[in-house]
Amino acid sequence: MDKAERDYWHLRSLEIEEEPRFPPTNVADPLTARNLFQLYVNTFIGANLAESCVFPLDVAKTRMQVDGEQAKKTGKAMPTFRATLTNMIRVEGFKSLYAGFSAMVTRNFIFNSLRVVLYDVFRRPFLYQNERNEEVLKIYMALGCSFTAGCIAQALANPFDIVKVRMQTEGRRRQLGYDVRVNSMVQAFVDIYRRGGLPSMWKGVGPSCMRACLMTTGDVGSYDISKRTFKRLLDLEEGLPLRFVSSMCAGLTASVLSTPADVIKSRMMNQPVDESGKNLYYKNSLDCVRKLVREEGVLTLYKGLMPTWFRLGPFSVLFWLSVEQLRQWEGQSGF
């Protein structure tokens, strides 16, 4: 051992801990086209399995957010989650709870699958081993990668979000005596394009992308961070308990982060337009926030938080357990 090594021996472990090695040598599943395709299919299957169980909660949440406008005009009390569900079943029938499900399935093929695949691609360069041979991903890197992945995926899936919201609110419009606006997913696309052209397909893309960024950060990024944290602090091994706890944390985080943007997105997408395709109620997202806070109060931005959590909590658990189980059956390591 030379003099330099003797003088600075106490700093060697710190240097190994902080200095990442590229490319990571401990990633069990290499980044190949096959693995990316498997992940894409797995997330699509997992998303639809989870969505089939919790979709009625999403419909009720959207109804609550949109009905706030009607309550504001008539002076009536804001509808509760329970009252919304009960009224939908009593007046429109059980099938109203799955209004827009076809658009959601199509959206899952683009949004849910793509955001997870993009996150996996984006995070790979930032994974490294520490001195204990543990795979490490900095928290801010995970959050940044998930934020970016959510934005890109939602920008592509936005037209399906517009159709989904319109299909979910159609029953309420008919109940109030308005003309029929949506009969099917294809007809909804045609009608939106006919009224506003291609730009109308991306109406509300700003708040929609912001919500997707926050939700993906809370869902995908938080799930990844939670798994690594619980492994280290609680000494949990890869398996059902670790996946369940991590997905619960992810669902709660996603709900808290995404609800305000979700309210704005629903109001922007559901508002009518004039013959030239111009919005009639809100000029843009900031105008929507300003009017909501001034006319309905700050808490309106969290209207539907509980049904959002009731939906995203179970969705996150079912989604991640399904994806992880499919990966396990395919002989891959945990996400």
Curated annotation (Swiss-Prot):
Major localisation: mitochondrion
BP GO terms, sorted: response to cold
Keyword Ligase: no
Free-text disruption phenotype from the record: RNAi-mediated knockdown is adult lethal at low temperatures. At 15 degrees Celsius there is a severe reduction in the number of larvae and flies do not survive to the adult stage. Second instar larvae moved from 23 to 14 degrees Celsius show no heat production in response to the decrease in temperature. In second instar larvae body wall preparations, maximal oxygen consumption rate (i.e.
UniProt GO MF annotations: transmembrane transporter activity
Record's GO cellular component terms: mitochondrial inner membrane
Biological role: Mitochondrial protein that is likely to be responsible for thermogenic respiration. Likely to function in mitochondrial uncoupling i.e. creating mitochondrial proton leaks across the inner mitochondrial membrane and can therefore dissipate the mitochondrial proton gradient and convert the energy of substrate oxidation into heat instead of ATP. Involved in cold tolerance, it is required for development to the adult stage at low temperatures.
Name of the protein: Mitochondrial uncoupling protein 4C
Source organism per UniProt: Drosophila melanogaster (Fruit fly)
